[in-house]
Curated annotation (Swiss-Prot):
Belongs to the UPF0391 family. It is a multi-pass membrane protein. Its main location: membrane. This is UPF0391 membrane protein Avin_10980. Keywords: Cell membrane, Membrane, Transmembrane, Transmembrane helix. One of its GO terms (cellular component) is plasma membrane. InterPro entries: DUF1328. The keyword Membrane applies. The keyword Transmembrane helix applies. It comes from the Bacteria. The chain crosses the membrane at residues 4-24, 29-49. Coiled coil: none annotated. Pfam families: DUF1328.
Length: 52
């Protein structure tokens, strides 16, 4: 599960860079939402991955 979380974090960072950089101006809102969502998922899986 931690592997998937890292993959999603990388995808969210790429989407964020494209959205915030002006390359895909219309996708900025979606990139912000995806970045926040996958960042939260990454932190949650990081915490539960260490305890389990």
């Amino acid at each position: 599960m931690l592997t998937w979380s890292i993959i999603f974090l990388v995808v969210a960072i790429i989407a964020g860079l494209l959205g915030f950089g002006g390359i895909a101006g219309t996708a900025t809102g979606i990139a912000k939402i995806l970045f926040a969502l996958f960042l939260i998922l990454f932190v949650v899986s990081l915490l539960f991955g260490r305890t389990g």
